[in-house]
Amino acid sequence: MWNSLHMTQARRPLMLMILDGWGYREASEGNAILAAETPNLNSLLNEFPWCFLECSGEAVGLPEGQMGNSEVGHLNIGAGRVVYQDLTRINLSVRNGDFFENPVLLDAISNVKLNDSSLHLMGLVSYGGVHSYMTHLYALIKLARDKGLKKVYIHAFLDGRDVPPKAALADIRELDAFCKENGSARIATVQGRYYAMDRDKRWERSKLAYDALTLGVAPYTTSDAETAVSDAYARGETDEFVKPTVVTGSDGKPEAVVQDNDSIIFFNFRPDRARQLTWAFENDDFDGFPREKRPKVHYVCMAQYDETLDLPIAFPPEELENVLGEVLSKQGLVQLRIAETEKYAHVTFFLNGGQEKCYDGEDRCLIPSPKVATYDLKPEMSAYEVTDEVIRRIQSGKYDVIVLNFANMDMVGHTGIFEAAVQAVEAVDTCVGRIIEALKKAGGVALITADHGNAEQMENQHTGEPHTAHTSNPVRCIYAGKGEVKALENGKLSDLAPTLLDLLGVPKPEEMKGKSLILNE
């Protein structure tokens, strides 16, 4: 099929274009995708075959009903098989009791007992299931209780993106009540993920988070965690943006700070937003900001955050063999991965099965994301710069396969600001039109799809509040280009890699359990 066109002197690129957050929803209320002017995508949907792909729940290795996300989506896309996610693995471990015998977690507890020190549990206090899950925190609290620990402190990072913007007050109340019923754990600090979970090296944010944890110094102090959240709401801050707040005792001193010989368990399982704080604690060569204090701690990562750091991992990664990038490399094909900063890790690390390695023949291009506080201030983000560069790469004639991600619909969708999301959709549509035109001139074709939904639902239909989380809606996949493809059948994200290989005429490895979406009839 495609290989008959491909095996000429001039390479005709096959592109996988991932429009992050481009979900499908028929209802128009709060639907930024339907509200936007999208002549290019509309034209492609009318002209070329397309299908629906499932991108949430069991279709991507998550619990039934759990919304998808970018990490999960790109893992499944690259693997060509359903990849059972850390959330699913850890949930099962809690249910069957293995969690409470996990040797890495038990080592952290043994360190506390040996040194008569403290256990710090830090992470996102959320039922979102994207970066963490409340059940895992509760299991850690029970484990500490069962092992007789008395000094257990929780550093609560608040969500507001993968759940409603003001979900934290109820979650903190629930957590506080659970702590009182299950041992002696107490909440020591509260702050929004904007500070504690930055991933774009905005070190001034990470420093505020780190100082609250290690020095007990923060913009605000409070007598209890619930008051910290309600005071933040009174200041006009939603969960994501709650400024670091230290909980103090009756003596006015911090409830707890991280000290030498303490143990830390960072209970987030998704790596990208756990790295910066981990580097601040554990990287000897860290230069993001001056560390006034660097306690020597026993530091445990719930999952692998950075393979260059030799840290204990409670749930280490399961290696995936023969992912898309590896198969293309073995075939001697030249591939490009391109995205702006916000999604660069997704088209590289996650698409390669959660591995940092770069395959032979794999080029990578990172376009910096704009340095703005929130992306509603610049809905186009760096899409135009990404487009200029990818067109230049298409015209170079160097690449057989190009994987591109546009971050806009997801990142601007997370702000909950409808008008900005509409502008984001329109910016991406303009870019899609330019790229497809360049592909046509080069004799190339594209599969245009998404990893999950977001911008199609910007409003909570029950409360009228902004909807800032991903959705569980399906996404579309368009075959855009001339050729033999007449129809596509519905599938899931793990069918994309087999489809790309089918188009290239490359045999699918047996590890890939997905199917080609191409209907031959």
From Swiss-Prot:
Cofactor(s) listed in the protein's UniProt record: Mn(2+)
Enzyme class: isomerase
InterPro entries with a match to the protein in the record: Alkaline_phosphatase_core_sf, BPG-indep_PGM_N, Metalloenzyme, PGAM_B_sf, Pgm_bpd_ind
Gene3D superfamilies: Alkaline Phosphatase, subunit A, BPG-independent phosphoglycerate mutase, domain B
Gene Ontology biological process terms, A to Z: carbohydrate metabolic process; glucose catabolic process; glycolytic process
Note accompanying the cofactor annotation: Binds 2 manganese ions per subunit.
Protein name: 2,3-bisphosphoglycerate-independent phosphoglycerate mutase 2
Organism: Methanosarcina acetivorans (strain ATCC 35395 / DSM 2834 / JCM 12185 / C2A)
Lineage per the UniProt record: Archaea, Methanobacteriati, Methanobacteriota, Stenosarchaea group, Methanomicrobia
Gene label: gpmI2
